A protein has these predicted regions:
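Long, well-ordered core segments of solenoidal/helical folds
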Residues: 235-275, 308-335, 387-409, 445-469, ...
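Active-site lining segments of carbohydrate-active enzymes
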Residues: 345-354, 371-445, 507-517
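Non-catalytic carbohydrate-binding regions of carbohydrate-active enzymes
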Residues: 402-405, 442, 455-468, 472, ...
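A domain-scale signal for long, ordered structural cores in large, multidomain proteins
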Residues: 421-432, 438-470, 475-508
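Well-ordered alpha-helical scaffold segments within catalytic/enzyme domains
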Residues: 286-305, 365-384, 429-444, 485-499, ...
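Carbohydrate-binding/catalytic loop surfaces
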Residues: 255-278, 329-360, 408-430, 467-489, ...
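Carbohydrate-recognition beta-sandwich/jelly-roll modules
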Residues: 2-390, 394-397
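Alpha-solenoid helical-repeat scaffolds
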Residues: 229, 275-285, 304-307, 353-364, ...
Length: 652
């Protein structure tokens, strides 16, 4: 059947699951207002009701045996199709460079590989907003669904799907189709949720315009679904708790390094070191150092004892500056050589994508935090060591010398000469905000022009909803992390130049972030997230790592800035969700998690069935990870310090 909406047409069809087969609902049973159909005693129906520029729907089923009902929508005859299921599907998930078999690819090729298929369905609560969308040249359509339904047997979970070439839809009840993507490289058996009697509802959208029209649809659904966490503790308590944990638990005085630590409760609750944190950026180094510097102002005298007991942010930045490589003109990726003596091969080399090279992500992250800290100290009338500026200028001059004519920075660089090895990826965007900070510190116009050229280049990927190639452990999957650099760079350039294009870049960047940042509460099945926890405000890392991580919180300050300069409270609300999310996660320790102390925060939070692979020592499932990887809580420490200082500045 055909549905008319906003002077455009959607093809709509339905199918019900009878045992293991999908049975189409006859088109003769369908009208513009829905359908009503009975098969062997099973009754299925749909009702459509116009509501402004959207179409509300209700699906119902009442059957003698457990069943499901799918609603298919299609937009045939268009070009440049691009499917979106937030957190899961962005086009084909960059299949051109992805390694088949690592994570879902929406494609017809490699049918012999479990994670390559022309149709993908997930639990709706796997998506940051429970909807499936289809973009094409000139339009965007989407169907949103309530992620959960009441049934005769209790709560069932509903589904969202994407299908080549031009279809998408939702399911009352769900099937992980063709398989369950729990973890990269390892397919799990398909699971499903069925019921005899249940109903669900939602809205259908059909907009003209570019792919970024999807952001308005997300915004409208957010207004209906938002359910923010309600933390108990204050920001100051959180900052103190994390700093104390850094200093008194995770710093290893004998090794002279911060460490990542883990345990396995209930058998083993002592947090033991499993990896030294020696990388200069991304998962260590500057990511830790900047918030440690902020703690001095956020906590005052209360910061001095823990900082004295461990390694201060200033000491970390000294080591980062000392990692300068004269041959490459960049920073070595490690502050100290690994066990094999390499100064660049961090933990990520085990994934096989990069080795014996500089990575733009680690180097860019490090120099971003180095220049950000220098800018912060300068703004507050405080000095910083000359070698920090010397290292930052040398690295960023090298990066500018090697910048491509179209604005791109490299993904990897040679360690032996000043040369880009691989251009493909978003990781180099981290150099852009560093260049703006350096301009603010030195007045060097070349830095500003280089950053502007870079943001113009990377904006193409942001507006196309297709930012890929930032982390080195995801095989250049579409990810959330690179866009964080784009947001920071756009904010700094708008502050510096006042150009309207950079304000638009910020809006596009925020919209892309909200395709990863949950706008509603999910109901995970397992400890510790089945005790009232809300996913609202947490952001998923990539299509390769299907879990929420804390990195998105670092742009909350930029979202609050965007709210101020636009007068649009939507961005402030999204930032407030994030602050509440991170504080509630801290409060799960130790009572709900069964281990640790207040101030720990894992990098893995499982709002649905993605990556819920952790197990207690007695075999019970755990919806997080028994590892305290310092970068994760460092991101939260950064966001908490910045918000606390913003609040105190307003009071002053």
């Amino acid at each position: 059947m055909k549905l008319d909406l906003n002077s455009q047409t959607l093809n709509v069809s339905f199918a019900c699951r009878i045992e293991d087969a999908w049975v189409p609902v006859p088109e003769t049973a369908c009208t513009q207002s829905g359908f009503d159909w009975t098969l062997n005693g099973a009754h299925y129906s749909a009702q459509f009701t116009p509501a402004g520029d959207t179409l509300c729907y209700t699906l119902q089923m009442d059957a003698p045996n457990p069943t499901q009902l799918r609603m298919w929508l299609a937009v045939p005859g268009q070009s440049d199709y691009f499917h979106v299921i937030p957190c899961n599907i962005y086009g084909d998930n960059h299949a051109a460079e992805a390694k088949p078999g690592e994570f879902p690819l929406l494609m017809k090729d490699h049918h012999e590989v479990a994670f390559c298929a022309p149709l993908w369905e997930f639990r709706a609560d796997r998506a940051a907003m429970p909807l499936a969308a289809l973009c094409w040249d000139g339009g965007v359509a989407a169907a949103a669904v309530e992620p959960y339904s009441e049934s005769e047997a209790g709560i069932i979970r509903n589904g969202v799907f994407a299908a080549l070439p031009d279809a998408f839809g939702i399911s009352l009840g769900y099937t992980n189709d063709p398989t369950t993507f729990k973890n990269r490289s390892t397919p799990a058996p398909s699971t499903r949720s069925m019921a005899c009697k249940a109903q669900t509802s939602g809205r259908i959208y059909l907009h003209s315009g570019p792919r970024t029209e999807l952001h308005e649809i997300i915004r409208q659904e957010y207004a209906r679904h938002q359910d923010r966490a309600v933390p108990r503790n204050t920001l100051r308590q959180a900052v103190q708790g994390m700093l104390d944990t850094f200093a008194y638990q995770n710093f290893d005085a004998a090794a002279g390094e911060y460490t990542n630590r883990c345990c396995r409760p209930p058998r083993e609750t002592e947090m033991r070191p499993w990896r030294l944190v020696t990388e200069i950026g991304w998962t260590g180094g500057g990511v830790l150092a900047y918030p440690l510097v902020l703690c001095r102002d956020a906590l005052g005298a209360d910061a001095e004892a823990p900082l004295a007991a461990a390694m201060s942010g200033e000491q970390l930045f000294d080591r980062i500056a000392d990692a300068y490589n004269e041959n490459s003109g960049l920073l070595n990726d490690l502050m100290a050589p690994n066990a094999a003596g390499s100064q660049v091969n961090g933990w990520w080399t085990g994934y096989g994508l990069v080795k014996d090279c500089h990575c733009a992500y680690t180097v860019g992250s490090a120099v971003h935090y180095l220049t950000k800290t220098m800018d912060y100290l300068h703004q507050n009338g405080k000095p910083c060591p000359a070698k920090w500026m010397d290292a930052a200028q040398k690295v960023l001059h090298t990066v500018m010398d090697l910048q491509r004519a179209d604005g791109a920075f490299g993904y990897t660089y040679s360690t032996q000469e000043r040369k880009v090895l691989d251009w493909s990826g978003f990781a180099g965007c981290w150099f852009a905000p560093a260049l703006v900070y350096l301009y603010r510190l030195t007045g060097e116009e070349r830095c500003l022009h280089s950053a502007e050229k870079a943001l113009d280049y990377y904006h193409t990927f942001v507006k196309d909803l297709n930012c890929y190639g930032t982390p080195m452990d995801t095989w250049k999957a579409v990810d959330e992390e690179g866009n964080l650099a784009f947001m920071r760079g756009s904010r700094l350039l708008y502050e510096q130049t006042g150009k309207a294009e950079f304000l638009q870049y910020m809006k596009d960047s925020a919209g892309y972030e909200f395709l990863w940042r949950y706008g509603y509460k999910t109901y995970p099945e397992h400890t510790p997230l089945n005790q009232g926890w809300s996913a609202c405000g947490g952001a998923v890392t990539s299509v390769s790592n299907p879990h929420i991580h804390p990195m998105g919180v670092i742009i909350d300050t930029d979202l609050r800035y965007l709210a101020r300069v636009t007068g649009d409270g939507y961005y402030a609300s999204r930032a407030a969700d994030s602050a509440a999310w991170m504080l509630q996660c801290l409060e799960l320790y130790p009572a709900a998690t069964g281990y640790g102390r207040y101030g720990i925060l894992s990098e893995r939070w499982c709002p649905s069935d993605g990556l819920d692979v952790e197990r207690f020592s007695d075999g019970r499932p755990f919806s997080s990870w028994f590892s305290h990887n310092l970068w994760a809580s460092a991101c939260v420490l950064e966001a908490a310090c910045e918000l606390l200082l913003e609040i105190e500045h307003k009071k002053g």
